[in-house]
Amino acid sequence: MTRPASAKRRSLLGILAAGTICAAALPYAAVPARADGQGNTGEAIIHADDHPENWLSYGRTYSEQRYSPLDQINRSNVGDLKLLGYYTLDTNRGQEATPLVVDGIMYATTNWSKMEALDAATGKLLWQYDPKVPGNIADKGCCDTVNRGAGYWNGKVFWGTFDGRLVAADAKTGKKVWAVNTIPADASLGKQRSYTVDGAVRVAKGLVLIGNGGAEFGARGFVSAFDAETGKLKWRFYTVPNNKNEPDHAASDNILMNKAYKTWGPKGAWVRQGGGGTVWDSLVYDPVSDLIYLAVGNGSPWNYKYRSEGIGSNLFLGSIVALKPETGEYVWHFQATPMDQWDYTSVQQIMTLDMPVKGEMRHVIVHAPKNGFFYVLDAKTGEFLSGKNYVYQNWANGLDPLTGRPMYNPDGLYTLNGKFWYGIPGPLGAHNFMAMAYSPKTHLVYIPAHQIPFGYKNQVGGFKPHADSWNVGLDMTKNGLPDTPEARTAYIKDLHGWLLAWDPVKMETVWKIDHKGPWNGGILATGGDLLFQGLANGEFHAYDATNGSDLYKFDAQSGIIAPPMTYSVNGKQYVAVEVGWGGIYPISMGGVGRTSGWTVNHSYIAAFSLDGKAKLPALNNRGFLPVKPPAQYDQKVVDNGYFQYQTYCQTCHGDNGEGAGMLPDLRWAGAIRHQDAFYNVVGRGALTAYGMDRFDTSMTPDEIEAIRQYLIKRANDTYQREVDARKNDKNIPENPTLGINP
């Protein structure tokens, strides 16, 4: 599975030499500050500012502020920044990872859980590791086969795989040291289990920490801690109760059995589905408080009424939970969204910092989860200190000033009142996995925020889970956007993306940047008073951290959702970012996922420096013309086809049958022209190796055929609109939205 440095890779379109990131390679020399000792690694992360040339952990330091003191690249010269080179990836899906740099070597995880080890100065491939994740696992996760990053400790690099494994490899050679399956064979996890691992690994006190995802399908969340040297499980903490209130023989037994179970009750869909509460992103160790913080996700199913019969707050959904690192013992929790029914996870970034609160310096957690509120908590005790919405939201009338609990808008409790609810934020949140940053120079938190509304409506007839599909307890035909000019125009006006400079003391926006649309990348803050961010429209920017002035722009030719990072080798500063459009927004939202532009996926790692001379090759593949669809379709089965499509296909191939630039747009797929060919792909799994699973156990042949007929109708409905959007003499789109506007 490991390929040595002699293995060759093609660079982007064959322009650069194999495995090369730098147009003018520099000789590699080890930097003096080393981080490869058992005792040294944790101390090196704690004292990261003593050797800022490295980037040793997902957020650089345990505080996860994503701030680097490097200032060779600064406001005065960032306009001279150039592409130094790029390293092409062989996974053209979403790239969300933050590479690590340890003593001059870059460790970058990519889609499908692959690992690339590169010389950080030259881009030379040192080794790569492919864990061979099965293609049919792709539809077991909600949001693309992404990976957000690795951990490093004692000469080993660790990362999770989409199918649930944790791999430890020798950092120098790439040879596997150990690997474990992080998902136990335990019936208490729910009958319909669907676990994936895509979060960044964290390592602290010799423990490798990893969570998982899967609550959209059926899962019971937990976090595991493994010995970094041996891979032995040290402890496990479940985030929601055992459905029989029995011990799991885990660190969480006492708190779940004596407190959390009472907030659920003995009945409801959670008993079958597991309850959710997966920790798929933020998982943080704070050396100041000596605590581990779990950022806990949504319920399984989403629907509160169906999940627990509308009873209780459902601990620990939508919460931060603090544990003792050595044992996993519960210390405290704060639940931001009790009774969650909107997919308002709290898995978004947990950051610690010191700031004044009522005239006293406090060590705090700052947190901007999906629900649209910014929270400040005491890091040691979990005490709620302050909270305020950082964007517009309509589900709550504010927070209780003493407890931080939401004061609900009754109209927003759609699962209890049975009404349709146009929710802001929607399930993609006001802030998602895109990392925020903090600058100790400006004392501002920089949030990549967005607004993506959603239509919530109870599933008709109660909770009816489907195999091989999302099971959230909603009517999936009601969240689809009506294909009328009026509906599209109204919805598009409600889509927004921002970079917010937020004052955590005054709890207010100091300045903001309006982007062309939502789903933009994470933030890096530097000592040069700079912010770096990639955008959904394929631009990579540097902004003035003090006022948001746009100081630099680069056309990356693909949407960027990953956060940048920075490092130095031999005294020279670099900025790097993984490029590659993807994630749940473009794969599920259909045509409206193109509001920022036609952001096709071209995946690579880009490195920038002040003396860069590389250029990306001209890219001209955005102007394809749609294939004229078959003229005839069976109107009698189209409605059933729409239901089946929204149930099984929409979350990967786009709302209303429209793609958004990453996975195949099925309206123009050749297979829709032939019934047998379509069934061979959808029913028999002809493309399983590429991530398209088979559905013959979930749907009948007639239901699969109804989907084909629906897609033919959608192709006919939208063909001329898509062609008109591309009209010029070279058939290259002039309108970046490619026909999504009426």
UniProtKB/Swiss-Prot annotation:
Which keywords appear in this protein's UniProt record, sorted alphabetically? Calcium, Cell membrane, Disulfide bond, Electron transport, Heme, Iron, Membrane, Metal-binding, Oxidoreductase, PQQ, Respiratory chain, Signal, Transport
Residues covered by region (Disordered): 722-742
Known catalytic reactions:
ethanol + a ubiquinone = a ubiquinol + acetaldehyde
Record Gene3D superfamilies: Cytochrome c-like domain (1.10.760.10), Quinoprotein alcohol dehydrogenase-like superfamily (2.140.10.10)
- Write one Gene Ontology MF term: heme binding
InterPro entries per the record?
Cyt_c-like_dom, Cyt_c-like_dom_sf, PQQ_b-propeller_rpt, PQQ_MeOH/EtOH_DH, PQQ_rpt_dom, Quinoprotein_ADH-like_sf, Quinoprotein_DH_CS, TAT_signal
Pfam families tied to this protein: Cytochrome_CBB3, PQQ
**What SMART domains does this protein map onto?**
PQQ
Where does the chain bind Ca(2+)? 216, 298, 343
Show the ranges annotated as biased composition (Basic and acidic residues). 722-732
The protein's name: Alcohol dehydrogenase (quinone), dehydrogenase subunit
Q: Which organism is it from?
A: Acetobacter aceti
Report the gene name: adhA
